[in-house]
Amino acid sequence: PNDQLDEEYSDGDIMIQACSNDPQVTFHAIHNLIRPFRDIIKIRWSQHGFISAKKNETPRNLMAFKDGTVNPRKNSDLKKYIFINNGWAKNGTYCIIRRIQIHIETWDRTALEEQEAIFGRKRSTGAPLTGKKEFDNIDLNAKNSKGEYVIDENAHTRLAREVKTSIKRRAYNYNDGTNAKTGNLDTGLLFICFQKSIQQFINIQNNLGHNDKLNEYITHRGSASFLVLPGIQKGGYIGETLFS
């Protein structure tokens, strides 16, 4: 719901993700990989992204809030929510990519207290409004002295948590300069997530898309989904379980 997708940032048959500490290395890795196949493939779209965070720290998005705090980390959770359990794609996963534009100028004019209410978390620490530290449990039933929910009924954190599932987020910020027509910054989030079923993402996004207060400040411009093949054993090859 509420998607405004641009065809130039959507779909595709094969996804390649290259990561490095140097964007020039990343560029040449992709360039050299696809160069031999120019006669048979065409790049549909691409997006450079970046993360600014120390090792083992939760990175922040361009809205200055931590992004990915509730990622599953235990092997049992990864097995339950992320990796496909059976069939030829066993130990593979599904990848969803969303190119989300952030209306940063509007966001910057929003008071900090309102920003934190929208996310349901403290900007400084990433802690839920019902806790003190980033990884404290979220109490969705907590109310203030006025009888109001501490975490707003339409807060991003609440709506995402209401859906009883989990996904593995791996999001990147992007900055593509300014829009020539509006003069506004073209910045946002290249949201990437992994799950054993695409329906997990659909259920979460449906809940967010209808009521999330954050929707006033973001627009989903691109969307794509891919199957990530299982890893390989010694002597094997990528896609072996599919082609053998």
Residue ranges of model-derived segments:
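Long, histidine/aromatic-enriched segments associated with O2/redox biology
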Residues: 1-244
